[in-house]
Amino acid sequence: MLQPKRTKYRKQFKGRIKGVAKGGSDLAFGEFGLKSQEPNRVNAREIEAARRAITRYMKRAGRVWIRVFPDVPVTAKPTEVRMGKGKGSVEYWACKVKPGRMMFEIDGVSEEIAREALRLGAAKLSVKTRFVQRIAE
């Protein structure tokens, strides 16, 4: 699963996801993509599950680009532990996704295969997404 090799600080504030994606909202590598429609935190397990679903359906043909990286540590306290006594330990890594952010891109397959592969991948994610295609010039 994806996670940073090292970070400046071990833990982070929860924060809020405001506004729309400034960068990373257009197709940069592939012919087809999966774009987020709502703000949410997507964890590393979801990203990996989506990647597996996409590559499995494509039968190793074509190429997949993951355009998001889980760089936010999410902490949790153990069950049945009283409040206080400091912040919990890092449970998993997540990525803050804004609306309009390109999450996955694929190339080297037909539109039907791309559409179905990204639909299967989207089912694994906790954000609403839509299929996008590069406009032929």
From Swiss-Prot:
Keyword Transcription regulation: no
GO cellular component terms, semicolon-separated: cytosolic large ribosomal subunit
ATP-binding found in the keyword field: no
Gene Ontology molecular function: any one: tRNA binding
Database matches in Gene3D superfamilies: Ribosomal protein L10e/L16 (3.90.1170.10)
GO biological process, one term: translation
Keywords carried by this UniProt record: Ribonucleoprotein, Ribosomal protein, RNA-binding, rRNA-binding, tRNA-binding
CDD domains cross-referenced by the UniProt entry: Ribosomal_L16_L10e
PROSITE patterns, per the entry: RIBOSOMAL_L16_1, RIBOSOMAL_L16_2
A Pfam family this chain is assigned to: Ribosomal_L16
Family: Belongs to the universal ribosomal protein uL16 family.
Assembly with partners or alone: Part of the 50S ribosomal subunit.
Its job: Binds 23S rRNA and is also seen to make contacts with the A and possibly P site tRNAs.
Name of the protein this chain belongs to: Large ribosomal subunit protein uL16
Upper taxonomic lineage: Bacteria, Pseudomonadati, Pseudomonadota, Alphaproteobacteria, Hyphomicrobiales
